[in-house]
Amino acid sequence: MRLRVDLLPHGNYPDVVVVIDVLRATTTAVAYLERGADALLLTRTPEVALALRPEVGEAGENRPLVLGGERGGLPIPGFDFGNSPVEAAAQNFTGKTVVMNTTNGTDAAHVAAQTGKHILLASLTNAHAAARRARALATEEIAIVCAGTDARVSLEDVYAAGVLAEYLLALGGFSIDDGARIALTMRRNVGNPIEALSSSVHGERLGQLGLGEDVRYAAQVSTSTLVPVLVSGEDVPEGTLKFTAG
């Protein structure tokens, strides 16, 4: 079995893809599902998300739609929530569908979905559960894909990829690529999770925006057993990816 880590999304994924955007999209996605959301719809643009509000609301009034997302770390005008896992964890989303659009993570998921057979969302908070689920699904390769920040490699995503890779290697039966070796080296040399995240460029930026609590939340390891898994079906609006708890 191959274990591959892409430091940025590249595509051409033949099997299982695990998408990581620790600060903050995949961490927040897990929080939404932890707080009862029925599903997540990931869009490519804010405009697609805003256009879905009446469509989804009319299609299922018992599953009201809320929008969550950010640009440059700040909430998108017209959205109900930003991209804060702390904010999400304080809400009750039971019976709701959350439409997400973010600067990096949602795009990475769309790249992964172009060819991947199974797409999972992972963060530090669900790292071990995501690794186990990926191992159970894979037949030839697990690709851990780091979303990065504005098309640049992100320390925090590579660190988290190393956490997943380390756990998967402990399960045995993998050959690894250089991306995985880089992630494992990062995991072993950077220090503890909060140090890794807070010292990253993105972590420092969030701290400057007054969002340091999000960084601390995202640094928790394996506090959740929920794994967002891509699903298909006729009820998935065009231009979106639907994830449910797996």
UniProtKB/Swiss-Prot annotation:
Keywords: Hydrolase, Magnesium. One of its GO terms (molecular function) is sulfopyruvate decarboxylase activity. Disulfide bonds: none annotated. It catalyses: (2R)-O-phospho-3-sulfolactate + H2O = (2R)-3-sulfolactate + phosphate. Gene3D superfamilies: ComB-like. The keyword Protein biosynthesis does not apply. Its cofactor is Mg(2+). It is an enzyme of class 3 (hydrolase). Its EC number is 3.1.3.71. Belongs to the ComB family. NCBIfam families: PRK14100.1 (NF010700). This is Probable 2-phosphosulfolactate phosphatase. It comes from Deinococcus deserti (strain DSM 17065 / CIP 109153 / LMG 22923 / VCD115). The lineage of its organism: Bacteria, Thermotogati, Deinococcota, Deinococci, Deinococcales.
